[in-house]
Amino acid sequence: MRTRRPRPAGPTRRPGAATGRCDRAPTGVAAEDHWLDFTVPAGLMPDARFDGRPARLQVHRVRPVYARGKCAGGPTRAAVLVHGRRVSGPAQFDVRHPAPGGGDLSLQTSLARAGIDTLAPSLLGYGLSTRFQDGLDDPGNASLRPYEADGSCTHPEGCDRTHNPVFPLDQQGSLLLTNPLGGERIAHSSSARFARTDVWVRDIRQVVDDAVARAKPTGGKVTLIGYSLGGVHVARALYAGNTMVPGAADTLRKVNRVVFMSSLFGFPTEEVTPPAGFATFPLTLNTRPSPTRLPQPRDQACTGRVVPGAADTLWDRILAQDPIGRDWGGTEPGNPTGLNRTPTFSTYGWNADVAGRLTPPTLVIHGLDDIDPAAPPTNATAIYDALPATMTNKALVHVACATHELLLEGCTGARCLPQAATVYGGRPGVPWAGPQATVKAALAEWIKSGTFNGAATGRFLVDESGVAEPVG
């Protein structure tokens, strides 16, 4: 099964881009989805009911197009982008909303226009990938009311516990009671967390293999990019000591560079069961998000950070990837508001010891104003400091006026046009288009050359005007 959505070529051809009967630079981009089939390995998912089940992964590919064919001799580059906890790959990395300064907010489109083939999977339990009828498709698998203090349960449908506040209790009562439950909580068909980190490690390795086969990058290597929780998954996928899902050495041979963007950090190397146990339900639900509000005076200083309408476009994109969840929620029967379904899971595999064993050149990029409690800016510093001293290409980049939603953030006003410098990734006299533009430029440079602002190694700050300077 395959859908194709070609995009118009647009004004991407530059003088000298065409040579004879071939193109040196892309003349456009094309987007398409494809699916990767697999069988769930025994013992990988927390609930054994899913062992041996057939499943598939959705992969959203945005690739460069060369109208006359690509000229021979130049390198072919590809990247795999791994999403975070709440948003699937296509919704996270291909937001088609107007960006400040022109173009759109889509990271995948920007990289494709730079000649980079991009593949963004929806990991198991996300987007249009398999969620299982008796897994995340069952509204009865959302959380129930908590157990009593003495451990008893007085509710006939059952009770729940959770190990992480991002998986709240009684979402059947708070979000689903009207649509679709019709006024009555129901018992679970699965009573365990949906996944553990290694479930998605398996996914990532399959997608890396697929990217190498489809994109045919030079040297048979791709750049692996992890955003937010995706950083944890990427790190674990490259960890040679992983015994639950062996095969890191083969994946490492196919990865030339790594990026950790707004990454979570500081988890035990292996899975540790909490004293009260893990969550006893597989499904958690998210309502429509609002743009992050920074505390004053940062909010006043970061003019134009919130791009008008971008959050609405993102939500529409999320629901388009969730045909079941979009019919859930709300308090008026038959008039659902839509909910974003995501899995519960246990997290491990990303800490200073694991970072110290990484071998691919590594870019760490993070918003300096990230107020997500799980992903403070200090995470980026800790990751960078833990990377091997022998790593020849490694860069740390903090971006001012950027939060955890830096892929959607812009800039307006006088601050965006520095008087005595040029915006990183831009041209003299052209205003900064915000953190989203910095991320696009930084990733394109890293994927192509393993440098940031021309340097192979170092710490950098991109200031409130988009100017990059070395730090320390």
Show the residue positions of the predicted features.
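Alpha/beta-hydrolase active-site loop
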Residues: 139-214
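Short beta-strand/loop motif that positions the catalytic acidic residue
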Residues: 358, 364-366
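N-terminal cap/lid segment of alpha/beta-hydrolase-fold proteins
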Residues: 16-74
